[in-house]
Amino acid sequence: MVLADLGNQLSSALRSLNETTIVNEDTINQLLKEVGNALSKSDVSMSLIIQMRKNIKDKIKLDQMAAGLNKRKIIKQVVFDELIRLLDPGVPLWKPTKGKSNIVMFVGLQGAGKTTSVTKLAYFYKKKGFSTAIVCADTFRAGAFDQVRHNAAKAKIHYYGSETEKDPVVVARTGVDIFKKDGTEIIIVDTSGRHKQDSELFEEMKQIETAVKPDNCIFVMDSSIGQAAYEQATAFRSSVKVGSIIITKMDGNSMGGGAISAVAATNTPIIFIGTGEHLTDLELFDPSTFVSKLLGYGDMKGMLEKIKEVIPEDSTSLKEIAQGKFTLRSMQQQFQQIMQLGPIDKLVQMIPGMNQLPQLQGNEGGLKLKAYINILDSLSEKELDGKKPITQKRIITIAQGSGRHPNEVVELLEQHKTFEKLIGKGGPGGGLGSLMAGKGGPKNMEQAMKQMNANGGMQGLMNSLKGMGGMGDLAKMFGGGGGGGGGMPSMGDLAKMMGGMGGGGRGGGGMPNMGDLAKMMGGMGGGAGKGGQNGFPNLDLD
């Protein structure tokens, strides 16, 4: 993601505070200069940068700070809060109501990714348990209905359109009426786009808006226009009641920061950002989370929510892992669940400190996991459960049945042995296996770390992950078993961090399970004074 460059520059500016022996006005001015330059390169409006600098200066009064206060930490927290404020219009997001028809109308210029975003949004809410449908009211662009039909079929979403009716208002009204009668909960109307803003486009939007009476009108814009997003968003808002904005193509240009800050200045909330071409490449936009990931603090709350979506707490494989067992069937189930979490490179971005990680090559890790799953699918039931050994002859047969090379089968079996050894050493209810299952406490974390250090530490684990593809850079990131490289915490630091995250889960009062951990993460932010904002944890920003 090109925005990573902005994140690295901002992180570098904040880290420079640690290198100064004395914190004074000159230190603050230099910090604000570096932050301002980084934002300017991302096409953030100079007027917004000047205002942000003023806000920071007004909040940091060095001569009024009590002796003994950590000035560096306070300054970093103020900068963090003001970056959030820069991107947050302070307007609540629209949320659909379960059990009733919610009509959503999409508007935007041609080429902004509007039709693709329509399908992504329908798919997003479908995964949340809503019944969804798409109405193609774009009768202007040739091939628009074909695109909707193709996308909707791929996402398994109901759709409506017409190859003969040329009046977009009639198509929109008819489609909405059909799905309302069916009780569809989210009906998304895709409207025509243009290559430029013109009176004909705006008049058509007004007519469709009057006909379908949307609960939310979403304006889709391309992030590459940078701060010009302000004028574009303002123009559309003057014609229809735009309630939310989706900013697309955030994965491919350096103007995203400018676009987001410009839109926030219009007091219109950004509801999603598009980060790729896949159906799942649509992320809920939260200013606090966005800045957190940008600065390398990660999004553990979001990561836990993703995990909870695909891994039930009563999973048989998790129960076996908690008992120190890790069969090939366990591995198969874990791989399948990892695939459901989305591209590995995007998952890695949610882990604190990973903004320093070189970008993984596409979805290389995902492709390797798919290959492994194909191999595991070719195993017999007894082989999966560890009740029958896999001979050299069977390796050849498995390779032929899965369409893979025998070396890949051997590689997979070696990966399994590594993880089986790590998980099994803790025994029932202890060590790494119990932690993976979401159980155990700080002592368990310590035990798990000892297990891992005995097997080469984090480096040993990462070496075993290299075979999955796309994980080589991740292995480099962690350095040796005793200490983290590239600014990442060492194994000891990681154990302390996890041990101090809060005790008491269920049972023996140790590490909370997945459900409790998600609740705990959700409650880490808030508060006044030095506390985080908008649910962001009170991180030690030193």
UniProtKB/Swiss-Prot annotation:
<dbReference type="InterPro" id="IPR036891">
    <property type="entry name" value="Signal_recog_part_SRP54_M_sf"/>
</dbReference>
<dbReference type="GO" id="GO:0005525">
    <property type="term" value="F:GTP binding"/>
</dbReference>
<feature type="binding site">
    <location>
        <begin position="248"/>
        <end position="251"/>
    </location>
    <ligand>
        <name>GTP</name>
    </ligand>
</feature>
<comment type="similarity">
    <text>Belongs to the GTP-binding SRP family. SRP54 subfamily.</text>
</comment>
<dbReference type="GO" id="GO:0045335">
    <property type="term" value="C:phagocytic vesicle"/>
</dbReference>
<dbReference type="GO" id="GO:0016887">
    <property type="term" value="F:ATP hydrolysis activity"/>
</dbReference>
<keyword id="KW-0687">Ribonucleoprotein</keyword>
<dbReference type="InterPro" id="IPR022941">
    <property type="entry name" value="SRP54"/>
</dbReference>
<dbReference type="InterPro" id="IPR027417">
    <property type="entry name" value="P-loop_NTPase"/>
</dbReference>
<dbReference type="InterPro" id="IPR042101">
    <property type="entry name" value="SRP54_N_sf"/>
</dbReference>
<dbReference type="GO" id="GO:0003924">
    <property type="term" value="F:GTPase activity"/>
</dbReference>
<dbReference type="InterPro" id="IPR036225">
    <property type="entry name" value="SRP/SRP_N"/>
</dbReference>
<dbReference type="Pfam" id="PF02978">
    <property type="entry name" value="SRP_SPB"/>
</dbReference>
<comment type="function">
    <text>Component of the signal recognition particle (SRP) complex, a ribonucleoprotein complex that mediates the cotranslational targeting of secretory and membrane proteins to the endoplasmic reticulum (ER). As part of the SRP complex, associates with the SRP receptor (SR) component srpra to target secretory proteins to the endoplasmic reticulum membrane. Binds to the signal sequence of presecretory proteins when they emerge from the ribosomes. Displays basal GTPase activity, and stimulates reciprocal GTPase activation of the SR subunit SRPRA.</text>
</comment>
<dbReference type="GO" id="GO:0006616">
    <property type="term" value="P:SRP-dependent cotranslational protein targeting to membrane, translocation"/>
</dbReference>
<dbReference type="GO" id="GO:0005786">
    <property type="term" value="C:signal recognition particle, endoplasmic reticulum targeting"/>
</dbReference>
<keyword id="KW-0963">Cytoplasm</keyword>
<dbReference type="Pfam" id="PF00448">
    <property type="entry name" value="SRP54"/>
</dbReference>
<dbReference type="GO" id="GO:0008312">
    <property type="term" value="F:7S RNA binding"/>
</dbReference>
<keyword id="KW-0547">Nucleotide-binding</keyword>
<keyword id="KW-0733">Signal recognition particle</keyword>
<protein>
    <recommendedName>
        <fullName>Signal recognition particle subunit SRP54</fullName>
        <ecNumber>3.6.5.4</ecNumber>
    </recommendedName>
</protein>
<dbReference type="InterPro" id="IPR006325">
    <property type="entry name" value="SRP54_euk"/>
</dbReference>
<dbReference type="InterPro" id="IPR004125">
    <property type="entry name" value="Signal_recog_particle_SRP54_M"/>
</dbReference>
<dbReference type="Pfam" id="PF02881">
    <property type="entry name" value="SRP54_N"/>
</dbReference>
<dbReference type="InterPro" id="IPR013822">
    <property type="entry name" value="Signal_recog_particl_SRP54_hlx"/>
</dbReference>
<keyword id="KW-0694">RNA-binding</keyword>
<feature type="region of interest" description="G-domain">
    <location>
        <begin position="1"/>
        <end position="295"/>
    </location>
</feature>
<feature type="binding site">
    <location>
        <begin position="190"/>
        <end position="194"/>
    </location>
    <ligand>
        <name>GTP</name>
    </ligand>
</feature>
<dbReference type="GO" id="GO:0005783">
    <property type="term" value="C:endoplasmic reticulum"/>
</dbReference>
<keyword id="KW-0378">Hydrolase</keyword>
<feature type="binding site">
    <location>
        <begin position="108"/>
        <end position="115"/>
    </location>
    <ligand>
        <name>GTP</name>
    </ligand>
</feature>
<keyword id="KW-0256">Endoplasmic reticulum</keyword>
<dbReference type="GO" id="GO:0005829">
    <property type="term" value="C:cytosol"/>
</dbReference>
<dbReference type="InterPro" id="IPR003593">
    <property type="entry name" value="AAA+_ATPase"/>
</dbReference>
<comment type="subunit">
    <text>Component of a signal recognition particle (SRP) complex that consists of a 7SL RNA molecule of 300 nucleotides and six protein subunits: srp72, srp68, srp54, srp19, srp14 and srp9.</text>
</comment>
<feature type="region of interest" description="M-domain">
    <location>
        <begin position="296"/>
        <end position="542"/>
    </location>
</feature>
<dbReference type="GO" id="GO:0030942">
    <property type="term" value="F:endoplasmic reticulum signal peptide binding"/>
</dbReference>
<dbReference type="InterPro" id="IPR000897">
    <property type="entry name" value="SRP54_GTPase_dom"/>
</dbReference>
<keyword id="KW-0342">GTP-binding</keyword>
